C-alpha cells in the first residue's frame, strides 16, 4: 500500500514503464523503457483526469526512453536495446508538437558510425546538449546540436575525456576499468554540468559553444562503486555558496556496496569542487552492509521550485529533499507508490514538476503517479 508524508496522490496513469517524463504547456510527455512502446503524450490540463492523446512506437531492438519538449518541438532519443532492426539506427527523433495530439516527425538525426545512439540530454528549445556515441570514440561523448532548423540539425561543438578519441590517435588508458560514457549534460548559463557515469562529473565552459573547455571535474574512480547520473546546479546561492547536487545511480555497482546516495558540492570556486554533504533516505543504510541494486538513489528532478528537490529513489519512490542548508540536506516529504502488479518492488525512475508544483513520478516497470505536495 502506498505511503505518503507531506504528499497526496492526485491521479494514477496506467502506462508501460518509462525512462523520462516531461511537462510542457499542460501536456505530459512520457518516454517508455521497452519497445515497441516509444512515447505517450497526455493532456493533463485536468491532472485528476489525464487523457492519452497520442502514442509513438519504435522497432524491437531499440528504445526511445528519453523525451524533452519546448517551443513546439519534441525531441526523443533512439538507443540500442538488445537485438533487432539494425537498419533503424540510433540518434534523435525531432517532432513538431505544436498540436500535441498530432506529433509530426520533422527529422531523424543519426549518430555517426555503428554506435548505440543517444542516451540522455538537455534541450532548451533551440540547442540540444546530448550524449551520443560517435565514430572513432570509445563510449558516449558530449555534443551540442543546433535545432534552429529542425529539419537540418547542425553540430556546434563536442567534448570528451582525453583518451576516448582513439581514431584521433589518443592513447586509451582504461583497459582495466569501465569505459568512459557521458550520461548527459545540463546547461545553466554558459556552463554545462556533465555526468560521466563511472568517470564522475565535469564542468564545461561553453561561452564559445564551438569550443567547450574544461573548467574542472571530480572523478572518484573505483573509490565510488556507483556511476554518476546527474550533476544539477542550484540556480542561486545557498548560505553564500554556489551548490551542485550530484546524484549517483544505484545500478552497475563496481563491487557490493550499500545503496547509492546524493552528494552536495560547493562550487563557489568552480575550479575546485568540494564535497560538503551527502543525503541518503533515512533508515535505508543502517549498518553499511551491501544491498541489492535499485534500492537507493536514481536521480533528481531537473525542474524544481525553491530549495526542495524531488528525487526518484528507485524502490523507495519519491523523496523530497530540502537543501536550504547545503551542509545538512534533509528529507521533508515522500511518496512511496504501490508496487506495480507482477513486480516485487516499485522502481521510481524519473520525476519532474510543473509550474503549479504538481509532481509527476514515473515507474520503470509500469505506471505514473501525479502527486501534490503541501510544501508550497
How would you name each of these model-derived features?
Residues 1-376:
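Feature marking well-ordered beta-strand scaffolds used for ligand recognition
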